């Protein structure tokens, strides 16, 4: 419901805020949902458990000016030294602006660029009013965080350009428990002519004079999520994606931290775009020493026409503040996403250990061999069997990556009676031969793609993305279907509905193996993503009991947009245990480990050629919310350790899904990385400790734990008992007998 600004008088009377003039106000203390947003005239305070975000509207210019984003402040705050209106053009670099427009003397990177009918890009968006909403409205057609009154409060600030009749509504949703402010923007054309949006940031924030470091995630296929940290220098630095999806190259996340900030100490500001398409993230340190940070649409991929009365809504950006280092920032993202982003029923429920057929057999299988693989999997204790690529295609059978995409009917040579008999056979298998539980069945699809060698492409070549008469560039022998077209969306929804109704399918792995080329317009990327989101929204709502996993050649779409619909994502096509330590640690900067798909694969590894002990590979895979095997199960039938490792993965899983992650030692800083998962109530914990290279005459260092109750006693692996204070201030030490050593240690509070 809407709360009118009349509530401000009541808040002032209660002493929650006091107008002090010139853009100053006192900040609410002891924040609850009722005072997460406090307003006094045109002064605004957004309050978290340990965070304050304060800004005001300049009474002369109507511009929104930032006062503070950081640790909680109280009492009156000093007014920023702003130039008089006549000095505006000469001194724009001194002003910390909330939503910087273009063309009026601020030469730093803008948050919005609007081309008017006459051709110019000048905007003058001034404060017009505001409203406060209990709860959080949904974003039309886009993934978004959610919450009820008491969980989240939303401030909407209305800006208006009197000359162009353009309105901008800035949304600030405050989740106090997580020190999170979620921002998005609506731009509406209220004039009579057409306008074009050429740039729109979901978030812009200006920081005062100080040194900052920029932390981000870079990579490529099979080496995603490498942590990058560099000093913010004068000028513009940034990154993004122009691939049509969030990409392996750069993740739509970054953090700003003080140079002295570590994993466990210091201030950190995290920013994560809830979006799966092309994006841009930029940070600029201006001549006056102020630092501006923005993230939103990639302007090179945006030219959005707005006719009279039409609106463009930006994706939202989640920003969190931490006074407990980068690790504290990550834990706030993780808790927020588990509770208020991932809408699946599986967000916090145990995931079944699975076996995926891909690296075990690739395209070489038939009904009989698949049934044998499933039987061998069930005997090991696997609870979900997944048939990957190669099961479909009639006239153009999918026996390699050269044909079949788009023709989503079972290959009659491999499955002469369709999927139902094989699925029935598999789902009648008993797990472990002693359990009453039956094996579940899952299947791989890549609905957004089409092979030219397919019946679908022969019938609808116009459904593939193309730019006029230019040649259509193939990648992995495939093209991209244009999901901006409603008929393509309906085709995918219909065949997926038929597939899921045809047999007892419990799991879908949704893949995407290439980016967008030959886009017909600069706005194709966003139109495409809106179509993808409509398909995701329809299917996940229609089949809520199906466990959906996202994939894009591994982690090419590991983003908060996909997580809104799918509770887990395949983290990387690289299943090498050593490489996965770095990839999974990096991914956890913004995304909860509960969302990571991680599998134990064969050796030598199919991507790196490296041979790593079975136990090490299994322990690394246990750190993902979806543990699985990616190999031929026949190679494991005589290994007694495998069923025990699967049982250990199931024991670990609840803590990985719902616990707080502490990265105790980083793989880029030490050859002995370590991580600890602690139950939210502190009753249990599990330590993962690795050795990444051989060491002669060098003992592994002690590892200090975090997040425990210092006054409580903890039993370590059911043996020795130590206080939380001892474990955190002294720690534990282990020795490793092999080049790639690993330990998984369970702790339980007494």
Swiss-Prot record:
Cofactor entry: Mg(2+); NAD(+)
Q: What is its main location?
A: secreted
Its activity depends on temperature as follows: Optimum temperature is 52 degrees Celsius.
For the keyword Nucleotide-binding, the answer is no
Tell me the compartments it is located in: Secreted
Q: Which UniProt keywords apply?
A: Carbohydrate metabolism, Glycoprotein, Glycosidase, Hydrolase, Magnesium, NAD, Polysaccharide degradation, Secreted, Signal
GO aspect biological process, one term: glycosylation
Identify the EC number(s): 3.2.1.22
The pH dependence is: Optimum pH is 3.5.
Keyword Hydrolase annotated: yes
Pfam families per the UniProt record, alphabetical: Glyco_hydro_36C (PF16874), Glyco_hydro_36N (PF16875), Melibiase (PF02065)
List, alphabetically, the GO terms of the cellular component aspect. extracellular region
For this UniProt entry, the molecular function terms from Gene Ontology, in alphabetical order, are:
alpha-galactosidase activity
Against PANTHER family, the record matches this protein to: ALPHA-GALACTOSIDASE C-RELATED (PTHR43053:SF3), GLYCOSIDASE FAMILY 31 (PTHR43053)
Q: Which family does it belong to?
A: Belongs to the glycosyl hydrolase 36 family.
Q: What is this protein called?
A: Alpha-galactosidase C
Report the source organism: Emericella nidulans (strain FGSC A4 / ATCC 38163 / CBS 112.46 / NRRL 194 / M139)
């Amino acid at each position: 419901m809407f709360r009118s600004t009349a509530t401000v008088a009541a808040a002032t009377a209660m002493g929650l805020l006091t107008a002090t003039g010139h853009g100053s106000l006192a900040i609410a203390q002891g924040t609850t949902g009722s005072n997460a947003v406090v307003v006094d005239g045109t002064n605004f305070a957004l309050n978290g458990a340990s965070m304050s975000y304060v800004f005001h509207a300049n009474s002369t210019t109507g511009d929104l000016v930032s006062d503070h984003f950081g640790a909680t402040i109280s009492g009156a705050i000093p007014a920023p030294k702003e130039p008089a209106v006549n000095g505006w053009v000469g001194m724009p670099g001194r002003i910390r602006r909330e939503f910087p427009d273009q063309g009026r003397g601020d030469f730093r990177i803008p948050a919005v660029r609007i081309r008017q009918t006459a051709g110019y890009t000048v905007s003058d968006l001034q404060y017009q009013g505001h409203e406060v909403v209990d709860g959080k409205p949904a974003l039309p057609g886009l993934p978004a965080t959610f919450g009820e009154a008491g969980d989240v409060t939303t401030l909407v600030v209305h800006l208006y350009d009197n000359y162009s009749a353009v309105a901008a509504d800035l949304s600030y949703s405050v989740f106090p428990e997580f020190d999170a402010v979620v921002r998005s923007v609506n731009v509406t054309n209220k004039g009579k002519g057409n306008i074009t949006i050429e740039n729109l940031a979901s978030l812009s924030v200006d920081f005062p004079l100080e040194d900052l470091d920029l932390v981000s995630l870079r990579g490529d296929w099979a080496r995603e999520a490498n942590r990058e940290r560099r000093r913010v220098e004068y000028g513009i630095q940034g990154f993004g994606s122009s691939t049509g999806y969030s990409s392996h190259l750069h993740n739509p996340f970054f953090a700003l931290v003080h140079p002295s900030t570590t994993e466990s100490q210091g201030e950190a500001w995290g920013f994560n775009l809830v979006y799966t398409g092309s994006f841009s993230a930029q940070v600029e340190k201006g001549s006056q020493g102020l630092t501006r940070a923005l993230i939103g649409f990639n302007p090179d991929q945006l030219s959005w026409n707005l006719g009279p009365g039409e609106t463009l809504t930006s994706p939202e950006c989640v920003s969190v503040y931490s006074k407990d280092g980068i690790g504290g920032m990550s834990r706030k993202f993780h808790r927020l996403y588990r509770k208020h982003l991932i809408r699946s029923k599986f967000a916090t429920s145990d995931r079944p250990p699975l076996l995926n057929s891909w690296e075990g057999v690739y395209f070489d299988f038939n009904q009989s061999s698949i049934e044998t693989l499933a039987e061998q999997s069930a005997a090991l204790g696997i609870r979900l069997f997944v048939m990957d690529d190669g099961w479909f295609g009639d006239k153009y059978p999918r026996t390699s990556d050269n044909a079949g995409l788009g023709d989503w009917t079972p290959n009659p040579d491999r499955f002469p009676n369709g999927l139902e008999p094989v699925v029935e056979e598999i789902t009648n298998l008993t797990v472990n031969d002693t359990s009453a539980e039956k094996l579940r069945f899952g299947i791989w699809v890549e609905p957004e793609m089409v092979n030219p060698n397919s019946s679908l492409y022969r019938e609808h070549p116009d459904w593939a993305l193309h730019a006029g008469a230019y040649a259509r560039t193939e990648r992995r022998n495939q093209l991209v279907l244009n999901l901006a077209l409603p008929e393509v969306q309906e085709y995918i929804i219909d065949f997926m509905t038929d597939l899921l109704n045809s047999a007892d399918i419990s799991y879908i792995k949704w893949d995407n193996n290439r980016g967008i080329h030959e886009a017909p317009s600069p706005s194709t990327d966003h139109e495409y993503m809106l179509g993808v989101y409509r398909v995701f929204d329809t299917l996940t709502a229609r089949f809520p009991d199906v466990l959906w996993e996202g994939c894009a050649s591994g982690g090419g779409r590991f983003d908060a947009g996909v997580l809104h619909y799918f509770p887990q994502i395949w983290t990387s096509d690289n299943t090498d245990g050593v490489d996965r330590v770095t990839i999974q640690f990096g991914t956890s900067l913004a995304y909860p480990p509960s969302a990571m798909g991680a599998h134990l694969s064969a050796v030598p590894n199919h991507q790196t050629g490296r041979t790593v002990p079975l136990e090490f590979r299994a322990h690394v895979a246990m750190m993902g919310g979806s543990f699985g095997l990616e190999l031929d199960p026949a190679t494991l039938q005589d290994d007694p350790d495998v069923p025990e490792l699967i049982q250990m993965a199931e024991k670990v899983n609840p803590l990985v899904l719902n616990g707080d992650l502490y990265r105790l030692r980083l793989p880029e800083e030490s050859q002995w990385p370590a991580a600890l998962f602690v139950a939210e109530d502190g009753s249990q914990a599990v330590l993962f400790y690795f050795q990444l290279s051989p060491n002669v005459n060098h003992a592994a260092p002690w590892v200090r734990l975090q997040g425990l109750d210092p006054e409580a006693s903890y039993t370590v692996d059911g043996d020795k008992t130590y206080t939380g204070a001892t474990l955190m201030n002294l720690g534990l030490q282990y020795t490793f007998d092999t080049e790639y050593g690993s330990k998984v240690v369970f702790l339980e509070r007494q």
